[in-house]
Design a protein with these regions (language model features):
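Basic, Lys/Arg-enriched alpha-helical interface segments
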Residues: 1-72, 81-85, 92-130
Length: 130
């Protein structure tokens, strides 16, 4: 079943969910719109400017959802073999090196989830404007 899952450490709230909830309402609504559409979007349609698929071997399983408002917001995610989306890491891009740091963190999280599947929980995307 396709859906959106989110990385949630056992001892605290899901970092990506907290990040999204803390955004400016207009930008949050834009990001949530893309998250609602994401499970039904074919891989071939995940192209710039709203998405980026990383080509380097180490990051080839990772994608980036891009939203722009007053700031540049990025959400790193992967598509699991069963078609589910797994949101790994979110950040505000201020410098080009921010992406590399986020990718490294996303790879680390992906490894944790592979070893401990219970760290991936269903993410209920709130409807826009709520």
């Amino acid at each position: 079943m396709k859906g959106v899952n989110i990385y949630k450490p056992l001892d605290r709230a899901a970092p990506v969910a907290r990040f999204i909830d803390g955004l400016d309402p207009k930008l949050r609504d834009k990001l949530i719109h893309w998250l609602i559409e994401l499970p039904n979007t074919p891989k071939a349609s995940l192209k710039e400017p709203h998405f980026k698929h990383f080509a380097l071997e180490r990051y080839r399983d990772l994608y980036e959802l891009r939203a722009r408002g007053k700031v540049l917001v990025r959400v790193i995610f992967t598509i699991r073999p069963n078609g589910e989306i797994l949101l790994l890491h979110a950040f505000i891009k201020r410098q080009s090196r921010d992406t590399m740091q986020a990718l490294e963190q996303a790879v680390s999280i992906m490894t944790q989830v592979r070893d401990h599947p219970e760290l991936a929980t269903e993410y209920t995307v709130k409807e826009e404007g709520t």
